[in-house]
Regions:
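Positively charged, amphipathic and often flexible ligand-engagement surfaces
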Residues: 1-243
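Structural motif corresponding to the C-terminal cap of alpha-helices
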Residues: 3, 23-30, 322-326, 359, ...
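Glycine- and acidic
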Residues: 3-7, 38, 92-95, 115-120, ...
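Extended, hydrophobic alpha-helical segments in both membrane/secreted and soluble proteins
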Residues: 4-26, 40, 134, 336-337, ...
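Glycine-/small-residue-rich active-site loops that bind phosphorylated ligands and cofactors
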Residues: 14-15, 45-48, 306, 343-344, ...
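Hydrophobic residues in alpha-helical segments
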Residues: 60, 138, 322-326, 344
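Terminal low-complexity tails and localization/encapsulation signals of metabolic enzymes
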Residues: 164, 180-183, 187-316, 320, ...
């Protein structure tokens, strides 16, 4: 009714796809046909930013409407890096070098400016070089700049107005209570207080102007596009040869589709669990049925509990094997534990399937369960290999666990 624009803001990476789903619903809603006030925020530090722009352009074409897009560099970098490490992702969803983000920002800006019929571009920046580059790229195209209240006045006083560049700048001011705004203000402090921040460097008299306005293309060429050498991939964050346990990103629709396909192949499988004894034939007995606690008509498998006689056999076998095993080097023991961990990860989906079906765990809890088992094996194997010696660390002998 009042043609007030509304932007869907950008937050952590795992919320991007659900935000795009919401954008699609709104843009294609029949009640909003012709309304050009629907906006979306895209973060240039995300590696998939250019492809998100392609998606928004395609969506605008399908809706025969124009979508407002605000391009920012991104304010959750620290948490994105940490989350990727904690979740055991294959790689980081964001760039690990600041100048890669700066270059991505300019590349995304050029792509947005080239889609005037589908996108109304808005560039949120306090970086003088980014501003000048966009002004040069844009020529006579329609767009606006944006800045935060209290931060961009010095820069944009030289941009706004007919006596300057004659460009529009929308000023963003946070509104709300202390409790609501605290997290927002902390993010702004972290973002602009970082040593690599343009705002931070601008007030530093030790930084020459030539270094302040360096072309990010030159920096990327100097490093041949390589990632930050101080950042190992998420699976290689631990010292030595210890590998982080692999996780799954449940916010990624492609990974969800693959997970669904992998898990479905095991639903028809019925498992049998019984005592496993060396040189001893387990007697036949009535097995106990195990059902899925979340779906009672789903029989997961059958369990045959050990008898007292079989426990005696297991203990006897362990006692017979103990002298040879206790003489095995810690490195060999660690290698076997590592192999066990690798085999669990090789059978990742089936392990997850069993945890979900037998214990009734959610997918996220099941993934954490499998990862914990793998990680414990690798953690203690590393300790055994590096810190144990048969001359100083004596085994306590066979132990029966119930």
């Amino acid at each position: 009714q009042y043609q007030i624009a509304l932007f869907i803001d950008a937050e952590e990476t795992e919320r991007l796809e659900i935000s795009l789903d919401l954008l699609e619903k709104l843009v294609l809603d029949e009640d909003l046909v012709g309304f050009e006030g629907i906006g979306f925020v895209i973060q240039a530090y995300q590696r998939r930013a250019p492809f998100v722009i392609d998606y928004v352009i395609d969506l605008a074409k399908r809706a025969n409407n124009r979508i407002m897009v605000r391009l920012v560099k991104g304010a959750y970098w620290d948490s994105e890096i940490k989350r990727a490490q904690v979740d055991g992702q294959l790689d980081y969803p964001v760039y690990t070098r600041k100048f890669h983000t700066d270059l991505s920002y300019l590349a995304c800006a050029k792509k947005m400016l080239g889609a005037q019929g589908q996108i109304y571009p808005a560039f949120a920046t306090h970086n003088a070089y980014s501003l000048a580059a966009i002004y040069t790229i844009a020529e006579d195209k329609e767009f606006e700049f944006q800045c935060l209240y209290g931060m961009g006045e010095t820069l944009y006083n030289n941009v706004v107005g007919a006596e300057h560049l004659g460009l529009a700048c929308r000023v963003y001011a946070p509104v709300g209570t202390y409790e609501t705004l605290l997290a927002y203000l902390v993010r702004r402090l972290l973002e602009n207080g970082a040593n690599s921040s343009f705002v931070h460097q601008l007030v530093d008299p030790e930084i020459p102007i030539e270094e302040l306005v360096v072309n990010p293309v030159e920096l990327v060429r100097k490093t041949a596009g390589a990632s930050n050498p101080y950042f190992n991939k998420p699976l290689a964050i631990y010292p030595g040869n210890r590998v982080n346990s692999k996780g799954l990103d449940l916010s990624d629709e492609l990974q969800l589709a693959e997970l669904d396909t992998e898990l479905n192949q095991y639903f028809a499988k019925v498992y049998t669990a019984e005592p496993l004894l060396w040189d001893y034939k387990v007697s036949e007995r009535e097995a106990k049925q195990v059902r899925n606690p979340a779906k009672q008509n789903d029989v997961v498998g059958f369990v045959s509990n050990a008898t007292l006689a079989e426990v005696d056999v297991a203990v006897s076998n362990a006692l017979r094997a103990f002298p040879e095993w206790s003489a095995t080097t810690p490195q060999e023991r660690a290698a076997r534990i590592i192999k066990f961990a690798n085999l669990m990860e090789l059978n990742y989906y089936e392990m997850l399937h069993i945890v979900v079906r037998e214990a009734g765990k959610t997918l996220s809890n099941g993934i954490a369960e499998v990862r914990e088992a793998v990680d414990f094996c690798r953690y203690y194997a590393a300790q055994v290999a590096n810190e144990f010696d048969n001359a100083t660390h004596q085994a306590i002998g066979p132990v029966v666990c119930i």
